[in-house]
C-alpha cells in the first residue's frame, strides 16, 4: 500500500507512523531521512540539497522532488511505503502523482490525523523541564507532584521558547495555512481520509486500520 500521512504538530502522527510501518511492513519515508541518506551517499541531488541547507536556504522543489523520485524507485518501496513530510504543497502533490505514474502505480490513501487547534495548543504548550536534571514534565499527561518543582530534586521547572504559547500558536497557524490547500487537493481526488486524533492512541490506530483494510 502506498500512503501519505498528514497531521499538524502535536497530532500524534509519529506514533501512528510507527504502528503502520510495523504492522504492514512498509518503509517509513520521511523528508528528513531522505535528505540525510542522499547527502550521506553523496548523490548529485544530495550534494545540491546540502549546498542549499548549508546556506540556510530552503531546498527547491526540483531537488526535493528528485530525491523523492530516487527514494520511491528503490526496491523496498515497490510494494508500498508511508510518506511523511512530503508533499507539503499542491505542486509537490502533483509531482508525486507524476513520479508514481512513471513507476506504474498511484497513491492508495492520504491519512490525516485531525486534531482541533485548542487541543494541539494544550498538548504542545504543556511541556516543562527541570533546570537541574533536565527531567521533562507535561501539565496534562505527566504533571509534577508540586507545581513548578521537579519530583526528583526539587529543581525549578522552566519552559523552552519553542513550547511557549505565542511560538506554538504561530507555528500552528503557518502549518494550518500550508496544509489546507493540500487537504482540499486530496479530498477532490477522493484519496483523503480524516481520522479523529483526539481519541486514545489505540483507538486512532483502530480507525487507521479500518481504512487500510478496505483496499
From Swiss-Prot:
It is found in: Cytoplasm. It comes from the Bacteria. ATP binds at residues 10-15, 127, 136-137, 199. One of its GO terms (cellular component) is cytoplasm. Keywords: ATP-binding, Cytoplasm, Kinase, Metal-binding, Nucleotide biosynthesis, Nucleotide-binding, Transferase, Zinc. Residues 30-59 are annotated as: NMP. Zn(2+) binds at residues 130, 133, 150, 153. Residues 126-163 are annotated as: LID. One of its GO terms (molecular function) is ATP binding. Pathway: Purine metabolism; AMP biosynthesis via salvage pathway; AMP from ADP: step 1/1. One of its GO terms (biological process) is AMP salvage. It catalyses: AMP + ATP = 2 ADP. Its main location: cytoplasm. InterPro entries: Adenyl_kin_sub, Adenylat/UMP-CMP_kin, Adenylat_kinase_CS, Adenylate_kinase_lid-dom, P-loop_NTPase. Gene3D superfamilies: P-loop containing nucleotide triphosphate hydrolases. AMP binds at residues 31, 36, 57-59, 85-88, 92, 160, 171. Its EC number is 2.7.4.3. Monomer. Belongs to the adenylate kinase family. Consists of three domains, a large central CORE domain and two small peripheral domains, NMPbind and LID, which undergo movements during catalysis. The LID domain closes over the site of phosphoryl transfer upon ATP binding. Assembling and dissambling the active center during each catalytic cycle provides an effective means to prevent ATP hydrolysis. Some bacteria have evolved a zinc-coordinating structure that stabilizes the LID domain. Catalyzes the reversible transfer of the terminal phosphate group between ATP and AMP. Plays an important role in cellular energy homeostasis and in adenine nucleotide metabolism. This is Adenylate kinase.
Amino acid at each position: 500500500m502506498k500512503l501519505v500521512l498528514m497531521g499538524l504538530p502535536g497530532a500524534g502522527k509519529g506514533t501512528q507512523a510507527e504502528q503502520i510501518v510495523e504492522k504492514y511492513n512498509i518503509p517509513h519515508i520521511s523528508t528528513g531521512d531522505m535528505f540525510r541518506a542522499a547527502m550521506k551517499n553523496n548523490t548529485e541531488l544530495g550534494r545540491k540539497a546540502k549546498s542549499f541547507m548549508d546556506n540556510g536556504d530552503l531546498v527547491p522543489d526540483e531537488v526535493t522532488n528528485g530525491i523523492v523520485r530516487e527514494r520511491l524507485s528503490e526496491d523496498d518501496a515497490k510494494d508500498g511505503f508511508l510518506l511523511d513530510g512530503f508533499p507539503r504543497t499542491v505542486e509537490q502533490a502533483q509531482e508525486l502523482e507524476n513520479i508514481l505514474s512513471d513507476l506504474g502505480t498511484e497513491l492508495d490513501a492520504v491519512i490525516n490525523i485531525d486534531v482541533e487547534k485548542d487541543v494541539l495548543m494544550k498538548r504542545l504548550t504543556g511541556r516543562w523541564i527541570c533546570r537541574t536534571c533536565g527531567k521533562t514534565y507535561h501539565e496534562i499527561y505527566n504533571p509534577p507532584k508540586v507545581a513548578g518543582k521537579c519530583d526528583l530534586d526539587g529543581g525549578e521547572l522552566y519552559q523552552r521558547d519553542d513550547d511557549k504559547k505565542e511560538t506554538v500558536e504561530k507555528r500552528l497557524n503557518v502549518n494550518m495555512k500550508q496544509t489546507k490547500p493540500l487537504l482540499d487537493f486530496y479530498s477532490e481526488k477522493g484519496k483523503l481520509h480524516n481520522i479523529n486524533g483526539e481519541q486514545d492512541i489505540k483507538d486512532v490506530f483502530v480507525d487507521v486500520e479500518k481504512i487500510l483494510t478496505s483496499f
